[in-house]
Amino acid sequence: MQKVFFIISLLVGATITSAQDIQYKIVYDLSSSDTAVQATVLRQFNNVLKATPDAQLEVVCHGQAIYMLVKNKIYFEEKMNELKIRGNVSFKVCANSMKRNNVDKSELISLA
């Protein structure tokens, strides 16, 4: 998973240097409940926003990753709020994963 993020970062970095006027829209597909992987995604978002402050970023959480956005189970709410304030960052949750994991919409943090 980290290799994928590294490759995406390289591609974004290479593209940034060649075309500064492009509007970037990046969607991360996150399915891991591993907090190290989740922290990597948030770091990558931070890096992208440093390089291209106008980029539109979105994390789509499904599978066990939905717990990244569940109240009382979240590790990174402060970092996620900071990202949301800095740029066009959104966090989405797969409805099928919520149903499968018996998570109600009311259990999600306000960012989701």
For each feature predicted by the language model, list its residue ranges.
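Bacterial Sec-dependent N-terminal signal peptides
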Residues: 1-21
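Secreted/extracellular ectodomain signature
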Residues: 20-112
